[in-house]
Amino acid sequence: MKIELDSFSGNKIYPGRGTLFVRGDSKIFRFYSSKTASLFKQRKNPRRIAWTVLYRRKHKKGITEEVSKKRSRKSVKAVRGIVGASLDVIKEKRNARPETRNATRAKHAEAAKERKEKEAERRKAAKAAHVAAGGPKVSKLGAKGSAPKVQATSR
């Protein structure tokens, strides 16, 4: 025995009861009584009609003891060492004070700045030595040994 549900009120429809309404887009609506069919055809909202199941669900009527708070399980992330840093190093960095963190950051920044300046000086010196050596300016293609440009022979 198949028990259907009223499309408007949400009530049960037992075999031999109710009517079917098939809309133009072939969607089927089942109604328990002419009352629910009439309200549906008037385009009434079942959430606003006090005796419908949808109204009772919306306004939390009836079944209150069944509702219990859903408990979500939170995944706990295990802290472990990664490549290049052991667990001890990670814990030490995590527990470091902001002052020490800022000091080490400043120290590393200073060291990087000095390295950059030394590299710039080295490049400058290399360029100066190259210019001092003199020598003719040769295009890169000429230096690579590319084919010489063909001279015009018509004149």
From Swiss-Prot:
Q: Which PROSITE patterns match?
A: RIBOSOMAL_L24E (PS01073)
Which is an annotated Pfam family here? Ribosomal_L24e
Q: Can you tell which superkingdom this protein's organism belongs to?
A: Eukaryota
Q: Which UniProt keywords apply?
A: Ribonucleoprotein, Ribosomal protein
Q: Does the keyword Ribosomal protein apply?
A: yes
Q: Name one GO molecular function term.
A: mRNA binding
Q: Where is the composition biased (Basic and acidic residues)?
A: 93-123
User: What are the BP-aspect GO terms?
Assistant: cytoplasmic translation
Cellular component per GO? cytosolic large ribosomal subunit
Q: Give the region (Disordered) as residue ranges.
A: 93-155
SUPFAM superfamilies in the record: Glucocorticoid receptor-like (DNA-binding domain)
InterPro entries xrefs: L24e/L24_sf, Ribosomal_eL24, Ribosomal_eL24-rel_N, Ribosomal_eL24_CS
Keyword Aminoacyl-tRNA synthetase attached = no
Q: Which Gene3D superfamilies match?
A: 6.10.250.1270, Ribosomal protein L24e (2.30.170.20)
Instruction: Report the family membership.
Output: Belongs to the eukaryotic ribosomal protein eL24 family.
Descriptive protein name: Large ribosomal subunit protein eL24
Report the source organism: Yarrowia lipolytica (strain CLIB 122 / E 150) (Yeast)
